[in-house]
């Protein structure tokens, strides 16, 4: 098993989970193709994390990418940046800028 993470990514976890659904239960090559054609910002971030996990497998254990499959994709909520928006009569409303922690675990088939 080879793991790669990206933390504090400025993508809402709800939207990132949609992009993560594109790569679940696929081989690494298929997932890369799916994410390369995805127009979501989260898809670009997940592709970078997937490439990092593949590089970990290739450099540490000399495993070919054709033999790898995705074992787990996890999108967790990170901390929120809190901003304020002015409202009528001197009021204000909170705006929450959400962040995500992305984790991709790849391994050999049949593992």
Curated annotation (Swiss-Prot):
It comes from the Bacteria. InterPro entries: Ribosomal_uL22, Ribosomal_uL22_bac/chlpt-type, Ribosomal_uL22_bac/org-type, Ribosomal_uL22_sf. GO terms for biological process: translation. GO terms for cellular component: cytosolic large ribosomal subunit. NCBIfam families: rplV_bact. This protein binds specifically to 23S rRNA; its binding is stimulated by other ribosomal proteins, e.g. L4, L17, and L20. It is important during the early stages of 50S assembly. It makes multiple contacts with different domains of the 23S rRNA in the assembled 50S subunit and ribosome. The globular domain of the protein is located near the polypeptide exit tunnel on the outside of the subunit, while an extended beta-hairpin is found that lines the wall of the exit tunnel in the center of the 70S ribosome. This is Large ribosomal subunit protein uL22. It comes from Chlamydia trachomatis serovar L2b (strain UCH-1/proctitis). The lineage of its organism: Bacteria, Pseudomonadati, Chlamydiota, Chlamydiia, Chlamydiales. The gene is rplV.
């Amino acid at each position: 098993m080879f793991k790669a993470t990206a933390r504090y990514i400025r993508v809402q976890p709800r939207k990132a989970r949609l992009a993560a659904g594109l790569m679940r239960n696929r081989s690494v090559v298929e997932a890369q193709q799916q994410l390369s054609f995805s127009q979501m910002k989260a898809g670009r971030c997940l592709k970078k994390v997937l490439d990092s996990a593949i590089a970990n497998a290739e450099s540490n254990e000399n495993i070919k990418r054709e033999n790898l499959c995705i074992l787990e994709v996890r999108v967790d909520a990170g901390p929120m940046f809190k901003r304020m928006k002015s409202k009528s009569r001197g009021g204000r409303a909170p705006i929450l800028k959400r962040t995500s922690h992305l984790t991709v675990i790849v391994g050999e088939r049949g593992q």
